[in-house]
Regions:
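A glycine-rich dinucleotide-binding beta-alpha-beta segment and adjacent secondary-structure elements
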Residues: 107-124, 271-275, 322-386
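Rossmann-like flavin
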Residues: 29-128
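A conserved FAD-binding loop/helix module that cradles the flavin
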Residues: 381-405
């Protein structure tokens, strides 16, 4: 999402973004695949009888994106700058992704393409607002693509750190902070932490009512991550899948919906929806000559310690026979492992909290500014604030603006 972020755009960071020919590919058991390309028209034509429905759904959003993005990437409750465009988006976005895709499209190809994008919500596809994630991600495919930074995601952090230091900022790492009292005196403190961590850091300084609100914050399913070193590119049955930087592995809408429902309800799906990135196809410096990598994750129950590697491999092998033969090594992390590495990832939840209707509106509390706390000098700026998870920097950007406006 960095390519579409007003914040990153304003910084003018010296990043080289790599945009594959297709944002995402979705393979099927018959050896075919559907791809979302930058060209909306080309993508629509690939959907056959659903071409018209796809155009009608996405074209108005693409045409209004320049204004719409400023309304989408901010708190849900706000005075819209482009009310008509936002209303057009909202009518569809509020719906549940499964029934929405079924009512909009006739073919399994179009329904599955939408379901794969909507599954980024970490919600059952029967839940309200899950359609919003499908709309936004397919919209981004056509307005900015799904690019990634050449050299790896670390270059984004390095560029941001360099900009901060150029302005006189300092960064201290390798130090555990257990209380806000450990911080040096300052007029403002912005915490990029989960609500649970904020309560632990601030303690009784926060009013009891606000602490109780943060304690009720619900975290969503976790992820199981598997990173593969490969001795060659993934041998997809549908060769065109190699044109995409991201691959959604999950078959039909019904299968994806079952996977997301299982994770939400505490079960480990036998055929999980897998998100796979194959970036060495387009950024060769990430692997030795002739070798490749693939990073993957699937959704699992909150706090899971279950090893999903075999199920992930089976899902990839299903659409790329011979994949297992190309594995040189694999590094895995359970949901609990991820939380141990980063305490913000409560139970392995990488979204900062469940993306339910209530938690999108009150994220993490219903306040005039969701970034503010009852303490006038303390602000929250993590993915648990609007607009939520993603590499867009808008949570911190909007929190900083709110803090400065408050004085």
């Amino acid at each position: 999402m960095a390519a579409a972020s007003p914040f990153f755009e304003s910084l003018g960071l010296e990043l080289e973004l790599v945009e594959p020919p297709a944002a995402v590919a979705h393979p099927f058991d018959d050896g075919s695949a559907v791809l979302a390309r930058r060209s909306l028209e080309e993508t629509a034509r690939s959907l056959g009888v659903d071409a018209g429905a796809y155009r009608r759904l996405l074209t108005p959003l693409v045409e209004s994106w320049a204004g719409l993005r400023n309304d989408l990437l901010r708190p849900v409750v706000h005075w819209p700058r482009h009310p008509l465009a936002l209303a057009r988006f909202g009518v569809s976005a509020i719906r549940s992704a499964g029934p929405f895709a079924t009512s909009r499209f006739e073919t399994e190809r179009a329904r599955a393409l939408f379901a794969g994008a909507a599954a980024h919500s970490f919600l059952p596809l029967e839940q309200p607002v899950s359609a919003s994630f499908g709309l936004v991600l397919l919209l981004l495919a056509h307005v900015s693509g799904w690019p990634f930074p050449r050299g790896g995601s670390q270059v984004i952090a390095d560029a941001l750190a360099a900009r901060l230091r150029s302005l006189g900022g300092e960064i201290e790492t390798g130090r555990q902070v257990s209380s806000l009292a450990e911080l040096p005196p300052s007029r403002l403190v912005l915490c990029d932490v989960a609500p649970r961590q904020l309560v632990a850091l601030a303690g009784d300084e926060l009013p009891a009512r606000y602490r109780r609100r943060l304690a009720r914050w619900r975290y969503g399913p976790g992820v199981f991550k598997a990173d593969f070193a490969l001795d060659g590119p993934i041998p997809w049955s549908a060769p065109e899948v190699a044109e995409a930087g991201t691959v959604h592995i999950g078959g039909s809408l019904a299968e994806i919906a079952a996977s997301e429902r299982d994770a939400w309800e505490g079960r480990h799906c036998e055929r999980p929806f897998v998100l796979l990135a194959q970036q060495t196809l387009f950024d060769h410096a990430r692997a030795p000559l002739g070798k490749h990598t693939a990073w993957t994750y699937c959704h699992v129950p909150h706090g899971s310690t279950f090893d999903m590697r075999d199920r992930i491999e089976s899902q990839i092998e299903r659409f790329a026979p011979g994949f297992r033969d190309r594995i040189l090594g694999c590094s895995t992390r359970t949901a609990v492992d991820l939380e141990h590495e980063n305490p913000n990832l409560i139970g392995g939840d990488i979204s900062g909290g469940a993306n339910t209707v209530g938690q999108l509106v009150a994220r993490p509390a219903l306040r005039p500014s969701p970034y503010s706390t009852p303490l006038p000098w303390l602000y929250l700026c993590s993915a648990s604030t609007p607009p939520g998870g993603g590499v867009h920097g808008m949570c911190g950007h909007l929190a900083a603006k709110a803090a400065l406006a408050r004085g």
